[in-house]
Amino acid sequence: MIKKYVFGTPFPTNAVVTEMETAKDKLPFLETDNQGTFNYALSENDIVYGLGEQIRGINKRGWQYVSWNYDNPNHHEDTRSLYGSHNFILIRGDVTFGAFFDYAGKMEFDIGYTRRDLMQIKAAKNDLVVYIITGENEKDIVKQFRKIIGRSYIPPFWAFGYGQSRWGYKTEQDIREVAKRYQAAGIPLDSIYLDIDYMERYK
C-alpha cells in the first residue's frame, strides 16, 4: 500500500507518474516537526537500504548522505554526495516500510550516524511530498515504488556489449583513434561514450 503526504507547496518534479489522492491521516512511522525534518527511531537490528548511487555498503546505517548532486571526480569513503539523488529508503527490521521523499532541493540523511538509534532526514524547506510504502516484504515494497516512478526502459542490445568511456576526448579524431586501436588489438567495442568535454562550458 502506498500513501501520499503533502507538506507545504512542493515543486512538481514529475518523479511520480501515477496520480494518487493525498492521505488525510497522520504520517506513519516518521515523526515530523513540519519544518522539513523527519525522525525515525532505529531499533538495534534495523537495516536501511536505498539512496541509489552512493559510496559505502548496501546497509546505509551509520553514515550521513546528502542529496545534492555534486560532480566530484575524487570519490572517497567519506564522500557524502555523488552525481545522482535517489531519495528512497527501505527500512527492514521490527517494522518494514519504504519512504520516498519527492523533493527537488537539498536533503540530508543522517542514518544512525550522530545517534545510532535515530535516523534524521532534513529537507532544506518543508515543501515536499512523502510517499510511505508498506507491503508483504522488501521486494513487494520496491515493486510498488517502481510502479509509481515508472519502469525503466529496456536497454538496446548494443548496451550489453563492451563500452569505452573516459574524460579527456577532445575531438572526433580522438574518438576515431580509440576505435582504431581497439580494432587493431582485436578487442570488440560496441560503443564509445563521451564525457563532458564536448559540451559548451561543460553544460
Question: What do the predicted segments below correspond to?
Answer:
Residues 188-203:
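Aromatic- and carboxylate-enriched substrate-binding clefts and catalytic-loop regions
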Residues 1-156, 166-167, 172, 179-184:
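Catalytic and substrate-binding clefts that recognize carbohydrates or anionic sugar/phosphate headgroups
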Residues 158-165, 190-194:
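Hydrophobic faces of well-ordered beta-strands that scaffold small-molecule active sites
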Residues 156-159, 199-201:
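A short alpha-helix capping/helix-coil boundary motif
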